[in-house]
Amino acid sequence: MNHARSFSLIHFAAASLASIGALALPAGAAHADDAPSPCAALKRIVAAAPSGFAQLAPEDGRGVAQPYGDDASCSATHASYQCTWTPHGDAGSSAAALQAVAADIAACLPDATHDVNSPPRQHFYLGERAQRTQITATTAGANKLKLVVSGK
């Protein structure tokens, strides 16, 4: 078999396998990179702090909760933005889910200082004291989590 012919057969086989793989996935199948990322939502909320949070909509914060719960309820005032949600059953305890949220905050906002790390409360801040943005994640009762972002 000559080189050109074996090259064509290899390409045909690869294309066939790729086609079969594409057909095997349902049309609406989720991919790993389709999972909601809390980073965009966290960054959007924190970026609003200097001018006030009232410009944010309830939907703006739901991305923070989506990896962990489906019932996020978010609201904004001029001074703060908050979301409350119920963690999925597979998240384990509220304290375990809170630790996961704190890990996301730390990963998404590497300039944030993590100054409180306890089972019921995680606290971060960004900026100098006079212009500080506070990020607090807490357990809210037996099966709820609450995230509050506030600014000066």
Feature locations, PLM:
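Short, low-complexity, Pro/Ser/Thr/Gly-rich segments in the mature regions of secreted, periplasmic
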Residues: A140-K152
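Long, charged/polar, surface-exposed segments that mediate recognition or autoinhibition
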Residues: G69-R121
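N-terminal leader/targeting segments
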Residues: N2-A4, P26-A79, S94-L98
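Short, exposed beta-strand-loop hairpins at the edges of beta-sheets
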Residues: Y125-A142
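Bacterial N-terminal signal peptides that target proteins for export
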Residues: N2-L17
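C-terminal segment of classical bacterial N-terminal signal peptides
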Residues: L17-A29
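Generic detector of solvent-exposed, compositionally biased contiguous segments
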Residues: Q55-Q66, D115-R129
